[in-house]
């Protein structure tokens, strides 16, 4: 083979060797890149796999803590409501004790008012003009009773005069029935004794007569 014919062959061989070297170098670079990229992914997957039980445990503990917190909050709200109700009941009892503590004393004074009322009614009205002493006595009784009723009113004690009202068993005590066509049945047509209430509480029912049904 001549030198001119061998020269192209040598150049082709050199190109082939260079090409193989280049391909091998690229493959190695790709392999290294693949290995470098894959290692973090595998490490992440392995780490996630290893941490899954711990995450699950923490999730369960968090759920249990939330449930316990909800139960404690519910108990706290119930206790707070119970305390508020108890405080309101106690305040009402104290208020009632202040208001109705004089109830028995008021009942005793009612007898005095009744006596003054009976005495006033017993005075013959037709003789007042001709008897100055009787007139002064009548006026004195009337003024005394009026003053006593004013004291009652200042302390929340007021009379109950249910004439012509519908009979109420909570405030009235029926002593008898009476025929009366001018009113509806079960109406108070006569009051023999006034009732009294202390701050809207009836402490003595009125003694009454009612119309027949």
UniProtKB/Swiss-Prot annotation:
Pfam families: GrpE. Residues 38-55 have a biased composition (Basic and acidic residues). GO terms for cellular component: mitochondrial matrix; mitochondrion; PAM complex, Tim23 associated import motor. GO terms for biological process: protein import into mitochondrial matrix; protein refolding. It comes from the Eukaryota. Residues 35-55 are annotated as: Disordered. Keywords: Chaperone, Mitochondrion, Transit peptide. It is found in: Mitochondrion matrix. Probable component of the PAM complex at least composed of a mitochondrial HSP70 protein, Roe1, TIM44, blp/TIM16 and TIM14. This is GrpE protein homolog, mitochondrial. It comes from Drosophila melanogaster (Fruit fly). The lineage of its organism: Eukaryota, Metazoa, Ecdysozoa, Arthropoda, Hexapoda.
């Amino acid at each position: 083979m001549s030198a001119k014919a061998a020269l192209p062959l040598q150049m082709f061989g050199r190109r082939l060797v260079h090409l193989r070297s280049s391909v091998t170098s690229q493959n190695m670079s790709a392999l290294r890149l693949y290995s470098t990229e894959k290692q973090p992914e595998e490490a992440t997957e392995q780490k996630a796999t290893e941490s899954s039980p711990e995450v699950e445990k923490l999730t369960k503990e968090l759920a249990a803590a939330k449930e316990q917190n909800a139960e404690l909050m519910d108990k706290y709200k119930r206790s707070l409501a119970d305390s508020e109700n108890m405080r309101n009941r106690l305040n009402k009892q104290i208020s009632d004790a202040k208001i109705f503590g004089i109830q028995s004393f008021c009942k005793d004074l009612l007898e005095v008012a009744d006596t003054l009322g009976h005495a006033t009614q017993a005075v013959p009205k037709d003789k007042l003009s001709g008897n100055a002493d009787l007139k002064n006595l009548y006026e004195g009784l009337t003024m005394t009773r009026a003053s006593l009723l004013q004291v009652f009113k200042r302390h929340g004690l007021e009379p109950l005069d249910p004439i012509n009202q519908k009979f109420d068993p909570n405030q009235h005590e029926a002593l008898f029935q009476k025929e009366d066509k001018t009113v509806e049945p079960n109406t108070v047509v006569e009051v023999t004794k006034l009732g009294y209430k202390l701050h809207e509480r009836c402490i003595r029912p009125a003694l009454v007569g009612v119309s027949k049904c």
